[in-house]
Amino acid sequence: MSLTNKNVVFVAGLGGIGLDTSRELVKRDLKNLVILDRIDNAAAIAELKAINPKVTVTFYPYDVTVPVAETTKLLKTIFAQIKTIDVLINGAGILDDHQIERTIAVNYSGLVNTTTAILDFWDKRKGGPGGIICNIGSVTGFNAIYQVPVYSGSKAAVVNFTSSLAKLAPITGVTAYTVNPGITKTTLVHKFNSWLDVEPRVAEKLLEHPTQTSQQCAENFVKAIELNKNGAIWKLDLGTLESITWTKHWDSGI
């Protein structure tokens, strides 16, 4: 899929991987890049505009933990402004297993709520045009970092939720896939808390292993968006992009 003249809404598009991905996106000659994030970063927005002045870059403050009704209200404003949204990227995330409720709220519940809100506009059963959802998971959604089970569990939930969305595409007209970064050099992993402090040096130990840069991750992130494969579970690790096969151990039969 060509991203030329597409309208993309990026939740948390100013974070570590998020900002580098936004930089790559504007190079693709989008029509609009709408960034939703908790904290405004005027310098980053200005930089994105300067990279490609042909792309309209706008920012709206957004906390993914707000009720669905609040998200729907914000999306209504965005649709009124740019008329159509082609791709929604759900990228909000925190890594701190001391914050159990917030980890689940940001990493999973917020993603579900944002998705639910945009379906109000996209669902073909309501006369919507359909759309594409790219959800950011993590390789910990496949195999947990067991010292951070809350974070890992939230990412496993993202993978399962998104796989379900993909199977619902014939009904809703909305396709979906996950991008799942491996350990990436960002502020997220430089210092974080393990669950019940089971490993005080978890961040330090993790970074002893091979990592990738956020730029490497961002380049493959955008490649995955361009490949636009419904139901794909993309692994973005050590500078590579790979579609993995989820092992089926049970089938509901429906």
Swiss-Prot record:
One of the GO biological process terms: alcohol metabolic process
Catalysed transformations (reactions): a primary alcohol + NAD(+) = an aldehyde + NADH + H(+); a secondary alcohol + NAD(+) = a ketone + NADH + H(+)
Cellular component annotations (GO), alphabetically ordered: cytosol
Enzyme class: oxidoreductase
Active-site feature positions: 151
Coiled coil: none
Residues that coordinate or bind NAD(+): 10-33
EC number assigned by the record: 1.1.1.1
Pfam families assigned to the protein according to its UniProt record, in alphabetical order: adh_short
GO molecular function terms noted in the UniProt entry: alcohol dehydrogenase (NAD+) activity
Amino-acid positions noted as binding substrate in the UniProt annotation, renumbered to this chain: 138
Family label: Belongs to the short-chain dehydrogenases/reductases (SDR) family.
Subunit field text: Homodimer.
Protein name, entry field: Alcohol dehydrogenase
The species this protein was found in: Drosophila subobscura
Gene encoding the protein: Adh
